[in-house]
């Protein structure tokens, strides 16, 4: 759960809280790479698999973005593509919360390019692309580009030919550079995570990541696994 302390997530959340994209309608999150795993995390009896290993971080971030510990409406798929164990290495789920926003999360072990972003975020005022090393967002000011009044009749040009909707949006684009060193990025977010634990245990600060919150995250895991039962094929060696 240290990923909630990542620079990219903190900056992304700050921008979304400012409503730079207006009302967020769709969030697509992905952890794509090419991998053929053969370690303990490919084994169900050891609680392995793409969801509990990789997607767990993203699902917790999505819960925070939604601002809710509710069990969302979930549609999911889990399969074994490249790994040698019995736990899933591919996972895809859509989660719709009561706020109306749809969240998608994917872990794909067959992406040899792996050049996509971590998050694509779509709102009524624009779009955001979130990478570990930068955030790009394109948006407009609704006061500069007011919505047109509804027209019930067919649109026509002055010469009588058919016309089509034109928005003439004045786009603004911004980029925020982040630390490109992945090992340093992981070290920073982990340090922040354990620093908060220290402050809670030693100085009585409010616990940032509460057990009740994690309990609801596990409920999401359980629902995805209920929809995608995988047979246990391996057990602990004697």
Residue ranges and their predicted role:
Residues 3-85:
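Predominantly a Rossmann-like dinucleotide-binding segment in NAD(P)-dependent oxidoreductases
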Residues 7, 11-14, 61, 92, ...:
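Alpha-helical elements of Rossmann-like donor-binding domains used by nucleotide-donor carbohydrate transfer enzymes
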Residues 22-25, 226-238:
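C-terminal capping/lid region of NAD(P)-dependent oxidoreductase domains
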Residues 56, 106-114:
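Glycine-rich phosphate/pyrophosphate-binding beta-alpha loops
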Residues 82-86, 111-114, 129:
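Short glycine/serine/proline-enriched coil/turn segments at secondary-structure junctions
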Residues 93-100, 121-123:
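Active-site beta-strand termini and strand-to-loop segments that position acidic
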Residues 125-208, 233-238:
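C-terminal glycine/acidic-rich active-site capping loop/insertion
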């Amino acid at each position: 759960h240290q990923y909630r302390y990542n620079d990219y997530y903190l900056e992304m959340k700050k921008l979304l809280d400012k409503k730079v994209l207006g009302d967020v309608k769709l969030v697509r999150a992905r952890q794509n790479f090419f991998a053929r795993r053969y370690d303990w995390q490919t084994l169900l009896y050891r609680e392995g698999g793409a969801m509990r290993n990789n997607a767990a971080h993203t699902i917790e971030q999505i819960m925070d973005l939604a601002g809710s510990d509710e069990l969302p409406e979930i549609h999911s798929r889990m399969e074994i593509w490249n790994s040698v164990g019995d736990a899933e290495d591919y996972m895809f789920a859509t989660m719709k919360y009561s706020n109306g926003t749809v969240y998608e999360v994917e872990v794909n072990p067959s992406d040899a390019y792996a050049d996509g972003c971590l998050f694509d975020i779509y709102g009524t005022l624009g779009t955001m692309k979130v990478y570990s090393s930068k955030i790009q967002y394109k948006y407009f000011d609704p006061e500069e580009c007011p919505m047109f009044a509804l027209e019930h009749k067919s649109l026509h040009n002055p010469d009588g030919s058919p016309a089509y909707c034109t928005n003439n949006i004045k786009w603004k684009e911004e980029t925020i550079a982040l630390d490109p060193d992945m090992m340093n990025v992981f070290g920073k977010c982990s340090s922040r995570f354990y620093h908060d634990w220290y402050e809670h245990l030693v100085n009585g600060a409010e616990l940032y990541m509460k057990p009740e919150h994690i309990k609801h995250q596990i409920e999401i895991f359980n629902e995805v696994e209920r929809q995608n039962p995988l047979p246990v094929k391996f057990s602990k060696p004697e």
